[in-house]
Amino acid sequence: MSIDEKKKLLALHRLQQAAESLEEAQYLMTGGKSLRSVANRIYYGMFYAVLALLIYEPYTSSKHSGVLAYFNKHFVKSGLFPESLGRALSKAFELRQRGDYREYFELTKDQVEPLLDEAGQFVADVRKYLDEKVGLQEDHLKD
């Protein structure tokens, strides 16, 4: 298997992780479960999509903030993705941080629910971009 095919497989894996995270967020939301958990899954859905993009970039980071900054600088500010998606990713990160690390911070449905739709659009747009850039169709990959 070539390096390009391995990159495509990893990108597809990251996009699958993104889709699963958003499915989990939807399940938790409709089930009336913890909004902290919903926000966490929304953020990770978007984060995994960004990791799929970074497979094709000369960049690595051990910090989420670095990944987000790179996405905003190289994908949003360059015009490849709309500013609204950059804002949605930043909002998801902020809510996940607050929900996971602040002891007395409570998320509301009004904060979290709209972000679920934005996250779905985010992942769809990343997939479309990668499909156009490298042709991620699974049937084109060889063993």
Q: What is the role of each PLM region?
A:
Residues 1-143:
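Terminal alpha-helical segments
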